[in-house]
Design a protein with these regions (language model features):
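N-terminal glycine-rich anion-binding loops that anchor highly charged ligand groups
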Residues: 1-6, 28-47
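N-terminal small/glycine-rich loop or linker at the start of catalytic domains
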Residues: 1-16, 68-73, 126-128
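Conserved, mostly hydrophobic/aromatic
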Residues: 11, 31, 101
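Glycine-rich anion/phosphate-binding loops
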Residues: 17-26, 105-112
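Short, acidic/polar
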Residues: 20-30, 83-93
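Glycine-rich, proline-tolerant flexible connector loops at the mouths of alpha/beta enzymes
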Residues: 37-63, 102-111
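Alpha-helix-loop-beta-strand connector modules within alpha/beta enzyme cores
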Residues: 49-78, 117-129
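Catalytic beta/alpha-barrel core
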Residues: 78-82, 99-110, 128-129
């Protein structure tokens, strides 16, 4: 069994749409040091959400830069709200070496997002759903 830790993403809803650089780095360091295998982080509303009216303390690119030292210690990725999908967000995730994007949709709507999942996989990124 593998456990995904989404504290850095979903937990950020408690403080707004994301954690500060200091807290993000502190938690990435702690989670990887304690061998959490899969870590989801970034804007609580998902990659690209800052451009859709959901600003976080950091931009997606700033979160991605912050994660670079930890990419070889765990599968690190971000949430992608399927309704806010934009191809450039998948490109950005691939450019920064994310291991996965977790594509979220409303219950029963998964069939509407096969193109988004295909795009994620075509960029060499795991697509969690």
């Amino acid at each position: 069994m593998k456990i995904i830790d989404c504290t850095l993403r979903d937990g950020a809803n408690v403080v707004g749409n994301g954690f500060s650089a200091e807290l993000t780095e502190l938690m990435l360091r702690g989670l990887t040091k304690n061998h959490y295998p899969i870590i989801e982080f970034g804007n609580a509303k998902g990659i690209g959400a800052d451009k859709k009216g959901f600003p976080a303390p950091l931009t997606d690119e700033e979160y991605l830069q912050l994660a670079q030292p930890f990419l070889d210690r765990a599968e690190i990725g971000m949430f992608l709200n399927a309704k806010r999908y934009e191809p450039e967000n998948v490109e950005l995730a691939a450019q920064y070496g994310l291991a996965f994007l977790r594509c979220g949709s409303d219950a029963g709507d998964a069939h509407l997002y096969t193109d988004q999942i295909r795009d994620i996989k075509d960029h060499g990124i795991k697509a969690y759903f």
